Amino acid sequence: MIQQRVIRYIEKEHLFLPDDKLLVALSGGADSVALLRVLHTAGYQCEAAHCNFHLRGEESNRDERFVRQLCQKYGIRLHITDFNTTQYATEKRISIEMAARELRYNWFEKIKEECGAHVIAVAHHQDDSVETMLFNLIRGTGITGLLGIRPRNGAIVRPLLCINREEIIRYLQQIGQDFVTDSTNLEDEYTRNKIRLNLLPLMQEINPSVKNSLIETSNHLNDVATIYNKVIDEAKTRIITPEGIRIDALLDEPAPEAFLFETLHPLGFNSAQIKDIANSLHGQPGKQFVSKEWRVIKDRNLLLLETIRPEDESTLPYQLIKEEREFTPDFRIPREKETACFDADKLNEEIHCRKWQAGDTFIPFGMTGKKKISDYLTDRKFSISQKERQWVLCCGERIAWLIGERTDNRFRIDETTKRVIIYKIV
């Protein structure tokens, strides 16, 4: 019986405890209705949550009416919300499918906290898992993407992964439970529906049991992934430092590109980018690779990883405090790099700060000849990202201080100094 199989699966996968409160995602379709009926009949404490995305006109409102009647019939508390999905997708510049997913799961999490539910139960089943495997395979994926849908992801649990779509329909027929049909599921409109309606039937002509074969493969790969992920995690301790990914240690691994994929793919880098990053490991420093939120920079010995933040090029990322005082025989020049001392009379033009630029030069303190700032930073073994964040304090057109590093010898304190100006980073 379906109900007993689902209960055994819940216990086997440790999805939740008998006394836990469940928030069931209820669209009104066959899968979610079956999930609610199975859990409610089994005695679990359920509340339901329904989203009206207003994407299918009257159909969307029909679905809402149906779930209201269903929950009222069985005395199940129902939470309902409305979304302007099209507007959200336009504002976020994402697909309608992605917009609906983000809106749905963000709201589910909010309702879960408000009602005190322990988990959010969603109605993915074996056929969904097969379609996910194929979808990821077509798009390009690593071993994790070939595992299909997993029983648990944080607070999201999937009790129906032990049964398929055909069994769900048969269960609903046996208990005399109706449901609503989403017309888009019958149209060749979205990628997943192309897999469901076109690709899988072709595969079944070759192997009528292809769905079962893929589920068995997924279960086998799950065991393989456990070993694989353990090896990747161990490698991370050798390769990743607070500064970045050590290129020499990475190249000592048997499969550097696989390691890069598992590290960078979750950060939004696609397979082609990761291959380019792997090819850059033996090249010159300076190459940059960008995902939506992250940047990888090929430096001399490291791959630098940093989040992309919009920067105000005209505003210092720290504060400078200025102090002016008489120069006396007992004055001691501070040694900290965060502090710079100048002869006040030599700072005789407008003082301003900016990012250093290509071609900038200064005379480092204690020297007599000019040096390019780019060469100075290279000699100091600054990484590319550190160079990009370096600011200078200028007196007119001349650089007086490579901030936090070294002052210019032309503004030094000497025996003729009467007043000193001190700048300090805070």
From Swiss-Prot:
<comment type="similarity">
    <text>Belongs to the tRNA(Ile)-lysidine synthase family.</text>
</comment>
<dbReference type="GO" id="GO:0032267">
    <property type="term" value="F:tRNA(Ile)-lysidine synthase activity"/>
</dbReference>
<dbReference type="GO" id="GO:0005737">
    <property type="term" value="C:cytoplasm"/>
</dbReference>
<keyword id="KW-0547">Nucleotide-binding</keyword>
<feature type="binding site">
    <location>
        <begin position="27"/>
        <end position="32"/>
    </location>
    <ligand>
        <name>ATP</name>
    </ligand>
</feature>
<keyword id="KW-0067">ATP-binding</keyword>
<keyword id="KW-0436">Ligase</keyword>
<comment type="function">
    <text>Ligates lysine onto the cytidine present at position 34 of the AUA codon-specific tRNA(Ile) that contains the anticodon CAU, in an ATP-dependent manner. Cytidine is converted to lysidine, thus changing the amino acid specificity of the tRNA from methionine to isoleucine.</text>
</comment>
<dbReference type="GO" id="GO:0006400">
    <property type="term" value="P:tRNA modification"/>
</dbReference>
<dbReference type="InterPro" id="IPR011063">
    <property type="entry name" value="TilS/TtcA_N"/>
</dbReference>
<dbReference type="GO" id="GO:0005524">
    <property type="term" value="F:ATP binding"/>
</dbReference>
<dbReference type="InterPro" id="IPR012795">
    <property type="entry name" value="tRNA_Ile_lys_synt_N"/>
</dbReference>
<protein>
    <recommendedName>
        <fullName>tRNA(Ile)-lysidine synthase</fullName>
        <ecNumber>6.3.4.19</ecNumber>
    </recommendedName>
</protein>
<dbReference type="InterPro" id="IPR014729">
    <property type="entry name" value="Rossmann-like_a/b/a_fold"/>
</dbReference>
<dbReference type="InterPro" id="IPR012094">
    <property type="entry name" value="tRNA_Ile_lys_synt"/>
</dbReference>
<dbReference type="Pfam" id="PF01171">
    <property type="entry name" value="ATP_bind_3"/>
</dbReference>
<keyword id="KW-0963">Cytoplasm</keyword>
<dbReference type="InterPro" id="IPR012796">
    <property type="entry name" value="Lysidine-tRNA-synth_C"/>
</dbReference>
<keyword id="KW-0819">tRNA processing</keyword>
